[in-house]
Amino acid sequence: VLAGGLSTEREVSLRSGKACFEAIERLGYKAELIDIQGFSEIELLTEYKPDLAFLVTHGDFGEDGRLQGMLDWLSVPFTGSSAAASSLCMDKYLAKMVFKKEGLPTSECELNYEGAQLEVLKEKLHSERLFIKTRRGGSSIGAKELKTQADLDEKQTELEEWLIEPLVVGREITLGFIKMKGEWKELPILELKAKNEFYDYEAKYTEGMTQFILPAPMSEERREQLVS
């Protein structure tokens, strides 16, 4: 089980890694939990010769294709997406361009730029309410609704690249798929109701801050629409 990493999501990854490690051991498998902080820890895998690397890493290095590429180089099978897919999807802007090309519904967006004006962005994105998030980060770190020009100006002083989108209001639904014996199977549909203004870092990782409803209540027609 590979966890930790070098990103701002390191703490979350370590907690998730510990939980996965304990679950895998309960299932009767022999497992090792490795805190990834660089290539030296990855080299340990040549000694362990694992049947599988279970990835619980987040953010830079862990989800951006670099770790996946190193595991490919070491011929170590791993969970999750390929190095190429990980690299693409870590960049929200590039991922959205691919989604649009493939005909998948996704909101319009703008990259934050020096001197950006909130009212101009509202006109460009045809929305009175805008939301900003990091271009490459995760766990909703730094994400917020842009209510004033000061909110936007604050982001100009940070080193991150930012993505600005219309604020989408609706139910928070998660639907996962798993491939078993060559066939894709959908997992139960989950609905999340955060106590905060949106499903932010605190709501995601603080016990009691989010209500999880499984399965999510919905019509069969809606369920089939989501699955398809």
Which residues make up each language-model segment?
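ATP-binding N-terminal substructure of ATP-dependent carboxylate-amine bond-forming enzymes
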Residues: V1-A84, L88-M90, L94, Y113-V120
